[in-house]
Amino acid sequence: MMKQKLSLYFVMGSIDCTKDPLAVLDEAIKGGITMFQFREKGKGALTGIEKYRLAEKLLERCRMYNIPFIVNDDVDLALALQADGVHVGQEDEVAERVRDRIGDKYLGVSVHNLNEVKKALAACADYVGLGPIFPTVSKEDAKQACGLTMIEHIRAHEKRVPLVAIGGITEQTAKQVIEAGADGIAVISAICRAEHIYEQTKRLYEMVMRAKQKGDR
């Protein structure tokens, strides 16, 4: 079930958008996203009540279409909203502590290598986000790209872990990422910066699903 939810994972905050974030999410949902992460970080990001209000409106849209709503690195916000889960990075709150706080909500953990995958699983993570696969412009603090070979390496040792790949993934590279062993792709700019968001999202969704069906996943 989780592996299906990860197929097209849209990550977004207000500063990622050149259009109204609510309109962007509406178009992305129509195009076929299967999971959504609210990531309000970086210079100019909303805080306090403004952040809460935007998250609340985005959550309402996800609820209407049964799209899991994940909050990036803000357990308090996730609990206040009754979101579906939390995603944390290696430099964020410790995964074990987050699991204790959120109970049976979804827990996702950013990883960059096999050792971090094993630690995430020990913390009872529901999925891992591996990346950046390719160089990315969406995160100022992004680590060095790990490439498709890291997906293959992790999949060789952890065949069952739900794994979504993130970082510089485009319409041109999505198929390769799935073929390497990822259960889905997580994208920010590939949707946020698209001129026609619905059409771009639909193409990405169809590409991922074709690749997954071909690989019998």
Swiss-Prot record:
Function field: Condenses 4-methyl-5-(beta-hydroxyethyl)thiazole monophosphate (THZ-P) and 2-methyl-4-amino-5-hydroxymethyl pyrimidine pyrophosphate (HMP-PP) to form thiamine monophosphate (TMP).
PANTHER family registered for this protein in UniProt: THIAMINE-PHOSPHATE PYROPHOSPHORYLASE (PTHR20857), THIAMINE-PHOSPHATE SYNTHASE (PTHR20857:SF15)
Listed GO biological process terms: thiamine biosynthetic process; thiamine diphosphate biosynthetic process
Gene Ontology MF term list: magnesium ion binding; thiamine-phosphate diphosphorylase activity
Family named by the database record: Belongs to the thiamine-phosphate synthase family.
Source organism of the structure: Anoxybacillus flavithermus (strain DSM 21510 / WK1)
Cofactor(s) in the UniProt record: Mg(2+)
Residues bound to 2-[(2R,5Z)-2-carboxy-4-methylthiazol-5(2H)-ylidene]ethyl phosphate: T136, V137, S138, G168, I188, S189
Descriptive protein name: Thiamine-phosphate synthase
Lineage: Bacteria, Bacillati, Bacillota, Bacilli, Bacillales
